Amino acid sequence: MFKFDNLILASSSKQRLCLLNQLGVLPGEIVIPNIDESPLKKELPKIYSMRVAKEKVIKVSLLYPKRFILGADTVVCCGRKILPKAETEDQAFEILELISGRRHRVYTSVYLYVPGKKLHYRNVMTVVKIKRLSVKEINSYILSGEWKGKAGACNIQGNAGKFVISMNGSYSSVIGLPLYETYSILSQYFPI
């Protein structure tokens, strides 16, 4: 693993750091970009994901204009409805009930700020189908607490993985950072 002192990860996500480490990359610093992540009125999920990821990177780049900034955002949606990160057990139950037995889309956008105001980005869509969940399964999963802070209230690396019937797209993107796309951007500037 190589530490790149001039690379900042603009994220509070432990999963994103772990995925970045899988590429052999250790950022010099992690900065949490405190931005408003509320969707705009009638904003489509893909556009939302791209906007939020870009805003994270730009916010941190204003503090560190001479460093590379990597940021990402993941959003889960059913149709055009953006599903929030559940904040309560009741909200998690509603989200899980909504995606139960259905296909839903996961968009992850990744941005790299390059000193000099250049931005590179990629957006990845993955379609995930979850089995029809019983009330007992939903309640059991909620008790695990794994839904906290997760887009769509699902942690497919944990207990929710057993509910996934199919996935068409990038597994790492669903977790929070599309590895292939991130590698293709970073490898232009870093020896990875």
UniProtKB/Swiss-Prot annotation:
Write the Enzyme Commission number(s) for this entry. 3.6.1.9
Q: Which InterPro entries match?
A: ITPase-like_fam, Maf-like
Q: Where in the cell is it found?
A: Cytoplasm
| Keywords of this entry | Cytoplasm, Hydrolase, Nucleotide metabolism
Q: What does this protein do?
A: Nucleoside triphosphate pyrophosphatase. May have a dual role in cell division arrest and in preventing the incorporation of modified nucleotides into cellular nucleic acids.
Protein name (record): Nucleoside triphosphate pyrophosphatase
> According to its UniProt record, which protein family does this protein belong to?
Belongs to the Maf family.
